Amino acid sequence: MSNFHNEHVMQFYRNNLKTKGVFGRQ
């Protein structure tokens, strides 16, 4: 359970970074 939660958070964090990068370039 803890491992699955960790993976989910990392995926969400990576998506967040990607979105922030796109918005930052605009």
Curated annotation (Swiss-Prot):
Database matches in InterPro entries: Stp
Keywords per UniProt: Host-virus interaction, Inhibition of host innate immune response by virus, Restriction-modification system evasion by virus, Viral immunoevasion
The Swiss-Prot or TrEMBL record annotates one GO molecular function as: nuclease activity
A biological process (GO) of this protein is: symbiont-mediated suppression of host innate immune response
Please give the Pfam families that the UniProt record associates with this protein: Nuclease_act (PF08133)
Q: What's this chain's function? A: Plays a role in the inactivation of several host DNA restriction systems including EcoprrI or EcoR124I. As a consequence, it activates the host anticodon nuclease PrrC. However, the phage-encoded RNA repair enzymes normally offset the damage.
- Reproduce the free-text note on domains from the UniProt record: The conserved N-proximal 18 residue region of Stp is critical both for its anti-DNA restriction and ACNase activating functions.
Q: What is this protein called?
A: T4 Suppressor of prr
Q: Which organism is it from?
A: Enterobacteria phage T4
Tell me the name of the encoding gene.
stp
